[in-house]
């Protein structure tokens, strides 16, 4: 074998090694490398089933926000895979199918049926089959078990939300739930809670008792109740008579309804007691004396209503609104305080009116979101605010008038001077002064009329007054928002308030009497026949045509009676209509309609559905009372919000003035008055008015038409045209004609005195000061007072003690922070008071402190005067500052003259009285702190015992005693008493 040499170079060393190469056959073959092994293959194989299920899972979120998988079952996964394979197979077959074009569609390759035979046209159906099916309603019937289950569910809902349930049997029983004795319990309304004292305080039948047994079983029904636990305010509470401990009276049916206590014994409201027990029993209703006075006189003084009253407003909200009304009309710190009442009575009329306006405005703001529920309170406060709004009286105009004619006392200058004085007094004028002013205005009008006599006489033969053939465009009857789907007018709320007309001035048609009993309409000088009998339509055409002719009544031709003129010119709306030849247009037969208001004088008349009355019977105006249809037509143009006020004004103001058979002038005058209150009625269309010159009567045509024909027709077709009759300068005979009347069956119309007509609203100095004292030691209350009534700060100058107490509590600093960006004048007042408190604290005597305060009144008054302001206490603050300023100026003058004015004893008595009020507030604050402290100690004991073992009770009692002694002090006379009280509680 050959030997070869191989050279290996290692650095600088060269090494030669011999070697023999191996033969070719012995060379090792190439080694095959095995496949790569995945270390996670086994893990993936184990998790493949889980991942496969996770692929079909959905994600859901738990209540705490954690997202997790919701896995499908094996059956669901199989169904999903099967549907997926079917969709893939269908898609594949569709994609691989050969393309095709549909060019013709036949039935089995034959001809269409339309070519095989001719179509035979059958009879045409001219009617549409009825598609709607009649619905039948079954009366729900409940078994005894279902009824009990329903009562149980209602009880659970109402007891949770503090609602109420009404049980209706022979009489209604109202059950409400409130928290009593630590749980929600059922409460019924007893007689003494309504202000009535009866020997049996609560009565109910057996059915009601059974229902009360179910409704009263609330949570903690079986808890034991002691007689000493019951307090005032627990009247009517239903308790279990088997769980009572103490001196209780007799009860039955497993229920005990709390009434009151007599000689330590609690009586059931269903028990009949003697007269002596009833008189001496202590009722458990809160504020019993107050409600006795209120409820005892409420029923006697309330006014009759035209509806059935229901309790639809929560009592708590009513109480809050009553508080708003009281503080808006008669503000006081205590309603029983005679000083508040006297100070209110001593206010000048001008100041009272200003404060009334301000308090009414603040009352509306306090009402807030409840304005929609308490619309009557909103309306009253709005009217009060409007009536007491300050009038801008110009003294310059008064002086100019007085300089011109002040010394002249003859007419008409005397009347002008009276009006000048009247305008200067503004809203302080009395009713007598209003009457004198109106008489003076009447005298001036007569003087002007007599002075300008320019009445001209014209020739009646040339008089023409054609009736327009075009109908008036009534926007209110054309607006889509006021029409239903059949284009009929929607009365809305006006329909409800129109019942004041129907109940007082209309009567129902009695079908038993027949229509003939209502055909003749009586008036002072004759009769007019209605077409009400034509509601019975004869089917004979000749008879029908005969009835359509009517009964003709001849009227005189066109004369001076038919015209009205002013300043020699005709007032055409106040005249009778004529034809082209000058002859009068005579009325024809007007057919009757059912339950319609017929309006419009020109063109085609308009028929408006009458508002629904109290029944479905037909209504007709009472004898001599047809002019109410004019006010009913005006109601169409009244908005739904003003409908109530409009109908009341017509009932209480217009109708009593018109009296029986008013003249056209009086009717027009009342319409003019209503137009001032409601301007939208100026274009209200009127019913057709017929003029009877023979009897000097104007007839207002209603829905029953007129059988009598031949009357003249008045051209006036709207309220604005009818108002033209209300003019003394109008020369017209028609304005003195009679129209309609008032029924004698409405004696209540004379009783229109409002119970709210007297009284007013003012924040007196005493009430404002008490309100300020209430918040000195209550930061939250004071913050709210500063936001609502910042001018309460001014009243702190009445007492140096109050001023320094407010400074020490940081109230002035808080006021500056609250108002520095809103109203800088209030922030300046707070800064001045803060500086004043520092100077007062440096004074050594009370008299010196008062002198410092009185001296600063001028600067405070200059900073406070800020024009018109809506805050309740703004006028009070100005009045206080003005009094202090004037007193300081007078005292300064007397002091310079050598007469010292300050009486040390008087100042000390005043300060002592105000300081006592401040101390009482602080005592109440401390008492509240003690109560809270005791409650915390008792609650901590309960929590301690619930967590720790019972044998540690003694140690805990010693700790509590030590804490109590540390708080109250070892020498505190009440310390031992408090310790004993807490130990007993433990």
UniProtKB/Swiss-Prot annotation:
The lineage of its organism: Viruses, Riboviria, Orthornavirae, Pisuviricota, Stelpaviricetes. The record marks 284-285, 740-741 as: Cleavage. This is P3N-PIPO polyprotein. A motif (Involved in interaction with stylet and aphid transmission) lies at residues 334-337. A motif (Involved in virions binding and aphid transmission) lies at residues 592-594. Potyviral RNA is expressed as two polyproteins which undergo post-translational proteolytic processing. Genome polyprotein is processed by NIa-pro, P1 and HC-pro proteinases resulting in the production of at least ten individual proteins. P3N-PIPO is cleaved by P1 and HC-pro proteinases resulting in the production of three individual proteins. The P1 proteinase and the HC-pro cleave only their respective C-termini autocatalytically. Belongs to the potyviridae P3N-PIPO polyprotein family. The active site is at residues 192, 201, 235, 626, 699. Coiled coil: none annotated.
């Amino acid at each position: 074998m050959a030997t070869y040499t191989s050279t290996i170079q290692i650095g600088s060393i060269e090494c030669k090694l011999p070697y023999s190469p191996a033969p070719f056959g012995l060379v090792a073959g190439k080694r095959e490398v095995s496949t790569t092994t995945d270390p996670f293959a086994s893990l993936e194989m184990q998790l493949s089933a889980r991942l496969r299920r996770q692929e079909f899972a959905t994600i859901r979120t738990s209540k705490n926000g954690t997202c997790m998988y919701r896995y499908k079952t094996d059956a669901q996964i199989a169904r999903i895979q099967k549907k997926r394979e079917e969709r893939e197979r269908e898609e594949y077959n569709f994609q691989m199918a050969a393309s095709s074009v549909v060019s013709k569609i036949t039935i089995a390759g034959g001809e269409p049926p339309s070519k095989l035979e001719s179509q035979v046209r059958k009879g045409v159906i001219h009617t549409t089959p009825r598609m709607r099916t009649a619905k039948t309603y079954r009366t729900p019937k409940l078994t005894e078990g279902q009824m009990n289950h329903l009562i149980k569910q209602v009880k659970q809902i109402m007891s949770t939300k503090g609602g109420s349930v009404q049980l209706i049997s022979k009489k209604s029983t109202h059950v409400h739930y409130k928290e009593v004795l630590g749980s929600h319990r059922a409460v019924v309304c007893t007689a003494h809670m309504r202000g009535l004292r009866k020997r049996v305080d609560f009565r109910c039948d057996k059915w009601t008792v059974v229902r009360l047994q179910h409704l009263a079983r609330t949570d903690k029904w079986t808890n034991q109740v002691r007689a000493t636990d019951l307090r005032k305010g627990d009247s009517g509470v239903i308790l279990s008579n088997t769980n009572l401990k103490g001196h209780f009276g007799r009860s039955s049916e497993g229920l005990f309804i709390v009434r009151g206590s007599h000689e330590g014994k609690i009586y059931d409201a269903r028990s009949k007691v003697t007269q002596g027990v009833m008189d001496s029993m202590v009722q458990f209703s809160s504020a019993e004396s107050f409600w006795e006075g209120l409820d005892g006189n409420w029923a006697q003084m309330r006014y009759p209503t035209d509806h059935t009253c229901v309790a639809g407003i929560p009592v708590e909200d009513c109480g809050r609104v009553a508080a708003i009304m009281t503080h808006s009309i008669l503000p006081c710190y205590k309603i029983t305080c005679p000083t508040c009442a006297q100070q209110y009575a001593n206010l000048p009329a001008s100041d009272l009116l200003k404060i009334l306006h301000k308090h009414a405005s603040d009352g509306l703001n306090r009402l807030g979101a409840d304005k929609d529920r308490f619309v009557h309170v909103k309306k009253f406060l709005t009217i009060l605010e409007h009536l007491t709004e300050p009038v801008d009286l110009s003294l310059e105009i008064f002086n100019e008038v007085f300089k011109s004619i002040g010394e002249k006392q003859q007419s008409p200058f005397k009347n002008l001077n009276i009006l000048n004085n009247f305008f200067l007094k503004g809203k302080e004028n009395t009713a007598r002064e209003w009457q004198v002013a109106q008489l003076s205005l009447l005298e001036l009008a007569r003087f002007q009329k007599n002075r300008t006599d320019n009445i001209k006489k014209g020739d009646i033969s040339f008089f023409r007054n054609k009736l327009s053939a075009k109908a008036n465009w009534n926007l209110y009857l054309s607006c889509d928002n006021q029409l239903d789907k059949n284009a009929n007018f929607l009365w809305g709320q006006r329909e409800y308030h129109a019942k004041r007309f129907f109940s007082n001035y209309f009567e129902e048609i009695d079908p038993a009497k027949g229509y003939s009993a209502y055909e003749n309409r009586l008036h002072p000088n004759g009769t007019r026949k209605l077409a009400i009998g034509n509601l019975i339509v004869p089917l004979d055409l000749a008879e029908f045509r005969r009835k359509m002719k009517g009964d003709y009544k001849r009227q005189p031709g066109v004369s001076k009676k038919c015209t009205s003129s002013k300043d020699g010119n005709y007032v055409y709306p106040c005249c009778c209509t004529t034809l082209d030849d000058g002859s009068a247009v005579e009325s024809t037969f007007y057919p009757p309609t059912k339950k319609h208001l017929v309006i419009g004088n020109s063109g085609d008349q308009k028929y408006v559905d009458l508002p629904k009355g109290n029944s479905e019977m037909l209504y007709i105006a009472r004898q001599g009372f047809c002019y109410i249809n004019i006010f009913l037509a005006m109601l169409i143009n009244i908005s739904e919000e003003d409908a109530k006020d409009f109908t009341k004004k017509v009932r209480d103001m217009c109708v009593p003035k018109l009296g029986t058979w008013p003249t056209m002038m009086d009717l027009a005058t009342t319409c003019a008055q209503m137009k001032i209150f409601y301007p939208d009625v100026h274009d209200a269309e009127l019913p057709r008015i017929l003029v009877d010159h023979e009897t000097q009567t104007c007839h207002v045509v209603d829905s029953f038409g007129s059988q009598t024909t031949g009357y003249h027709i008045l051209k006036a077709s709207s309220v604005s045209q009818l108002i033209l009759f209300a003019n003394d300068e109008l020369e017209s005979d028609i304005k003195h004609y009679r129209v309609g009347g008032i029924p004698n069956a409405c004696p209540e119309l004379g009783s229109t005195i409002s119970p709210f007509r007297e009284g007013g609203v003012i924040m007196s100095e005493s009430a404002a000061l008490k309100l300020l004292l209430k918040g000195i030691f209550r930061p939250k209350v004071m913050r709210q007072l500063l936001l609502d009534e910042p001018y309460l700060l001014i009243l702190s100058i009445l007492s140096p003690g109050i001023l320094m107490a407010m400074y020490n509590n940081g109230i002035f600093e808080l006021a500056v922070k609250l108002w520095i960006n809103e109203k800088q004048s209030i922030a300046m007042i707070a800064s001045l008071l803060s500086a004043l408190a520092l100077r007062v604290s440096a004074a050594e005597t009370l008299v010196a402190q008062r002198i410092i305060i009185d001296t600063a009144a001028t600067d405070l008054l200059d900073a406070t005067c800020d024009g018109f302001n809506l805050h309740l206490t703004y006028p009070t603050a100005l009045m206080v500052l003005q009094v202090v300023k004037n007193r300081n100026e007078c005292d300064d003058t007397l002091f310079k003259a050598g007469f010292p004015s300050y009486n040390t004893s008087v100042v000390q008595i005043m300060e002592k009285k105000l300081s006592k009020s401040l101390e009482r507030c602080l005592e109440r604050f401390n008492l509240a702190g003690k109560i809270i402290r005791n409650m915390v100690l008792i609650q901590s004991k309960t929590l301690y015992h619930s967590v720790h073992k019972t044998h540690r009770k003694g140690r805990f009692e010693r700790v509590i005693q030590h804490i109590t002694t540390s708080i109250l002090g070892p020498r505190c006379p009440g310390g031992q008493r408090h310790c004993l009280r807490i130990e007993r509680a433990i």
